[in-house]
Amino acid sequence: MTHSTQQLSPEGVAEGKRGRLIRELVNRDKTPLIILIMAAVVGVVTGLLGVAFDRGVDWVQQQRLLALANVADYALLVWPLAFIMSALLAMMGYFLVSRFAPEAGGSGIPEIEGAMEEMRPVRWWRVIPVKFIGGLGTLGAGMVLGREGPMVQMGGNSGRMIVDIFRLRSPEARHSLLATGAAAGLSAAFNAPLAGILFVIEEMRSQFRYSLVSIKAVFIGVITSTIVYRYFNGERAIIEVGKLSDAPLNTLWLYLLLGIIFGAVGVIFNALIFRTQDMFVRFHGGDWRKLVLIGGLLGGMCGLLALLHGNAVGGGFALIPIAAAGNFSIGMLLFIFIARVITTLLCFGSGAPGGIFAPMLALGTILGTAFGLSCAHFFPQYGIEAGTFAIAGMGALFAASVRAPLTGIVLVLEMTDNYQLILPMIVTCLGATLIAQFMGGKPLYSAILARTLAKQEQARATVIAQEPAVENTPQIGK
């Protein structure tokens, strides 16, 4: 009798079981490796685009201000030059958008959300250069716009570009890399990797497909884009307000009151954005020449305002630490708030290529600081530091408007490096979100996407109605 099989030892049996378990686990995970590799590539490309865009905007702004500084002693030159330079830069952005890629106008985030549902096209070969150069123009002109919207849209389009270049055919790859690019773009814009992940999972929850592949891809893309950003810009917080004191427990009711105020402000702010967008559509009526002219006037106005009151224009990041430090009186803070609300509505509502994150965060900081100073005056026994309310307000307006409280909380904490304020942030953002929902307000980006899709269907119906009717005439001889 030949011994074809040998008796296994207990150690061998256990090792065999472990091997089978590992093989079953590996076989159960069907994540295509190519998607994860491409997610890393998307993150690198998006990070490089973000760094280039950020530095490009800074360079354009510096050159514009340098030219004005050279003629600062000549009033007859500095005022016309300020208007003309900003007007021309803005007109370049509006022209590129209106003539080559209308979907590159505005924030671009709703376009990515629509693309994730296969409802909006992704023409990356047009959108990336138009958004990049157009954004350099409008943001370089000093308009009240943010850099994060362009970065999110360029990131999402970079994901689709990688899909097309490497001919990835699966719907899973198309969706995962689009979401990866969007998350990587936000991460690179704010040096906030966790907020980038949460933004896609929370804000884009209606469009994002919660699968292991998509989640892994988003994580990898955010990691690589953040590494690229920090390689070029360092690891410091993007908004330096210093370490603020903890919020005492007996002051949490004030943060809840602040959240209630911001809930109402967020609903009103969104409604004003929609009305401003409709107003500009009535002004230009779809004529690109009128749109470019309007953009030039808005850009020139921002150029003049920069000379009169620089805090009323620009993205607002430079204003945030100044306001949070309590360098303005309550009256001046309210004046700046009203002025920036008007300029934000005009610049963003006109369809200029640029985001609204940064202006919104600045508005929240200003109003939050004013509230904090008021509380310090009326409740001196609490020893209130107004800067803590500035930080809470920064996230509260975002939470009320965008309806993504978790993203708002994490985003602000990552940007300011004040993680000890997480409890008042939660109270404020939750209060703002609940009040906004109670008042019937619509999330900003979802509402903009719905309006865009409605216009798309209306245009399609108009084209179909204008097509000549084909009559079925009987054929003779058959």
Swiss-Prot record:
Proton-coupled chloride transporter. Functions as antiport system and exchanges two chloride ions for 1 proton. Probably acts as an electrical shunt for an outwardly-directed proton pump that is linked to amino acid decarboxylation, as part of the extreme acid resistance (XAR) response. The record marks 148 as: Mediates proton transfer from the outer aqueous phase to the interior of the protein. The gene is clcA. This is H(+)/Cl(-) exchange transporter ClcA. Residues 1-32, 117-123, 167-176, 202-214, 282-287, 439-478 are cytoplasmic. Its main location: membrane. Residues 70-76, 233-252, 310-329, 377-386 are periplasmic. InterPro entries: Cl-channel_ClcA, Cl-channel_core, ClC. A motif (Selectivity filter part_3) lies at residues 355-359.
